[in-house]
């Protein structure tokens, strides 16, 4: 596993304040000390101009610009310094069409809500792996026994 580091900067993009709070708490519990927040993709694009995140965790369905468009914009220009930043989508929209759209846009990992700390840690580890291009995965952590604390969809969407 890739060690999780306090030195890494994580940008969380979600229009739900409750979800941003939960993600912040989980990331801090995992050892991340530098967490930036954006309440939509437009704000995230502004944050990225000032802070180069090592990892982006974004929601899929947001007002103004959805997560897929946000990722496509980041990945569009390969010469852009942020085109290779690892990206995880965390969403309650787990239908195959959403997973496929995310992966085609360039998302590194897909995390279905409700999230667990363990599932998030696994996705982060894979997203930050040096050979992440070869291990891009889309997994569904839906109807099975949770491996840690879970958060109900009502708190997240």
List the predicted regions and their residue ranges.
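Two-component/phosphorelay signaling modules centered on CheY-like receiver
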Residues: 17-36
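Helix N-cap/capping motif at the beta->alpha junctions
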Residues: 37-46, 67
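A Lys-centered signature of the CheY-like receiver
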Residues: 113
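Receiver (REC) domain active-site loop signature in two-component systems and cognate sites
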Residues: 62
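Short amphipathic alpha-helix used as the core "switch/output" element in two-component signaling
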Residues: 46, 68-82
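CheY-like receiver
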Residues: 126-157
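Alpha4 helix (beta4-alpha4-beta5 surface) of REC/receiver domains from two-component response regulators
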Residues: 21-25, 69, 83, 94-109, ...
